[in-house]
Amino acid sequence: MRAWLVIAVAVLGVRDLAAQAGQAPERTVTSVSFRGNHAIDALTLGAAIATSASSWTYRVPLLKHLGLGQRRLFDELEFRRDVVRLQILYRLHGFFEARVDTSVARTAGTVDVVFRIDEGPPVLVDSIVVRGVDSVLDARRLRGRMPLSEGKPFDRVEFDASADTVATALGNRGYPFASVFRNYTVDRAARTAAADYEAVPGPRARIGDIVVGGNQAVSAKIVGRSLAVRDGDWFSQDALYDSQRSLYQTDLFRYVSVGIAEDSTVAGADSLVRIRVQVNEGPRSRVRAGAGYGTIDCFRAQTTFSTANFLGNGLRLDLAGKVSKLGVGSPTDWGLSNSICSALSGDPFSERINYLASATFTQPAVFGRRSTLTQTDFAERRSEYKAFERNGVGSSLAASFGLGRFSLLTLSYRLTYGSTTADTAVYCVYFDRCEQQAIDVLKERHRQAALSLSLTRNTANSPIEPTAGSVVSVELSHASPLVGSERLISYNKAVAEGSWYWQLERGWVVALRLRGGVIRPGVAFVVDTSIRFVPPEERFYAGGPASVRGFGRNEMGPLVYVADTVLVDSATGANEPVNLRISPVGSYAIGLANFELRMPSPVWGSRLRLAAFVDAGELWDQTAAGLIPSGLKVTPGVGLRVGTPLGPVRLDVAYNDYPRQRGPLYEVIRTSSGAPQELRLVQSDYPGPPRGTAFFQRLQFQFSVGEAY
């Protein structure tokens, strides 16, 4: 009778609260904040309660009346429940003595809510005992892998996850039916907790047979090649996950499930289990098309046709076509270099559209489950901003081998036949003099072949906006007549790059990148002149939105200046070039370091992010005496990122206090008809056009899509 009376009083109390809430005037929640929280961040606390602030766009009158904001009303009953929700959340995380107080500032139509939290001392894990695994696992090492650890707050989520860790470890040792019973005791007075796990491994089992279902055009043999398990193997839960991942990576299936079949034992034998692979095939063919805009591409478009299981045996065919420089390059020169594509004005390598047409054949599981063989045939015209234009056809063959879960080893061979055109003045730098006959030889079509070996390890948690993990790669390349290249194009090249990401707290990320590379050319003879020639497309360039952001694209390294006319100041004797253009030469070695702190914006934090960064870089030129450094350059800056489905749209502003790069100044000598005939060296160490001294004149703006690294 007493119990029914208590329930009745509680129900009537809730009804009275609900009635009061219904009679109260509507008030808009303008802000919700937390004070005193340290163990749990505000974002997690906010997700655990019902009361939330209206969007900032709703609080701006103009945007509010345009219907862009979202209004959230204050609910008195839910607000009181939020106090209980927060107390329960803290108990789950080991803070049994946490207290929550509230402060509400009310006006006629709005409320501002503050939750004041006194977390109190946590209950700490005093001991963790794991029983039943001594004959199978090392209990001490197992405890080190468990999320719950001694000396830390007793977190119920980590307590449950630790039981899953024990079960998974047993499953990977061949025990598919392992059970883990868990219990804990809490001493509130001593503020300690003891966790106890009792494992029952069950029988150890091997794979009896593998059944594939749901496949239609793709044969069971092709499915089997991607599996990490075989008949007779000891059962492993990780191997099942790995098999599922490998099948998805083939691009043949839209759904894959790999697990123990319902009739999990084979012929009633506990020591054998049946694995069922259930798949749902994806579309046989896909067509994708897209268009976009970039500051150094102007308008661009691309289309891809892919067909899976081409000619059977799991082979995939990808046909791709890409074009860029639309609107500025012939035959689509619509005069946009004078308006929205003004960055390309004066770039001689943007006068024709760039294109790529390619056909790629990909065969998975050729040399093993984690291997892929890829052949690509292509024709292209591509250019690097103010540096060069490449025209050619070619083919590449690459064999990739997965090493563990995160690493990939690739051996590739690339053979091309084409020409690379750079500014004539750049070739003059190569020869240390301007001989048209020798320059014409370098501009001719040449056969270029390179053998490359690369190793990549990727543990980043996102390919678009990583917040943890790293991406490290090393690539070695060799080109010489030994592998099919012409003698003119002979070099050894090594490049290493690493990016690391750490999350300081929710939304705050530190990103670091280091990159280094060196290329050593062989000796060739051109018109009886000894030269160490490296094709412009193989050289190192720095400066731009993904490099040292205080410099324009490719403008940090050695430069060549070319003017239509060079006047001489009668008073100072200084050269005054007319219609000056700048051409990057490229370098033989590079060293880059980028440090960036990424943080949420105080307004519209779900879409806007801020960044503060420091970029540093140095390039080395090759001389007879060896590599000569150009000097370390360091440029700090800040940035704004706007989140989009394709990745963040990025605007960076960097400060550059360095004078312009010094380099040779050439004047174009023309014939009587006005056609360019040759170049004349005017000054071997021209300091470049003067840079403004005002603060804003030393700012370099960079606009791009996607993080810098």
Task: Place the predicted regions along the sequence by residue.
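Sec-dependent N-terminal signal peptides
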Residues: 4-12
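Sec/Tat signal peptide C-region and signal peptidase I cleavage site
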Residues: 15-19
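Periplasmic polypeptide-binding modules associated with outer-membrane biogenesis and secretion
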Residues: 20-299, 304, 318-336, 344-355, ...
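Conserved helix-loop functional segments at active or binding sites
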Residues: 148, 212, 229, 249, ...
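Repeated loop/turn-to-beta-strand initiation elements of outer-membrane beta-barrel proteins
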Residues: 254-256, 285-287, 298, 310-317, ...
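C-terminal outer-membrane beta-barrel translocator/porin domains of Gram-negative envelope proteins
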Residues: 273-274, 286-288, 292-299, 306, ...
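Transmembrane beta-barrel wall of Gram-negative outer-membrane proteins
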Residues: 346-440
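A short, conserved beta-to-alpha structural element at the edge of catalytic cores
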Residues: 633-658
